[in-house]
Amino acid sequence: MARVTVEDAVDKIGNRFDLVLVAARRARQIATEGKDPMVDVQNDKPTVTALREIEEGLVTAATLEQADLQAQEQQEHAEFASVANILSDQ
């Protein structure tokens, strides 16, 4: 597959500044948070993988925000369950 150009990804996001924010956020998820790439990695670095995901329309600012909210809700639910378990043992 040909390399992703910034212009291709900008068309999906809207402007270069938002593209940088979305791509950096997604690359960080792939590199350090253990999130699975949605495209074939092909020995690419996380930043290139993030740009390819954006170009293919798989990642947007809205999808990242929604995923973060779901993760936060799951964490809060687990914390509440732990607290309830501790209180019920007393």
Swiss-Prot record:
NCBIfam families named among the record's database cross-references: rpoZ (TIGR00690)
Top class in the EC scheme: transferase
InterPro entries: DNA-dir_RNA_pol_omega, Pol_omega/Rpo6/RPB6, RPB6/omega-like_sf
Gene: rpoZ
Reactions accelerated catalytically: RNA(n) + a ribonucleoside 5'-triphosphate = RNA(n+1) + diphosphate
A biological process from GO: DNA-templated transcription
Any one GO molecular-function label of the UniProt entry: DNA binding
Keyword Transferase: yes
Protein name (Swiss-Prot/TrEMBL): DNA-directed RNA polymerase subunit omega
EC number: 2.7.7.6
A Pfam cross-reference name: RNA_pol_Rpb6
UniProt keyword terms in alphabetical order: DNA-directed RNA polymerase, Nucleotidyltransferase, Transcription, Transferase
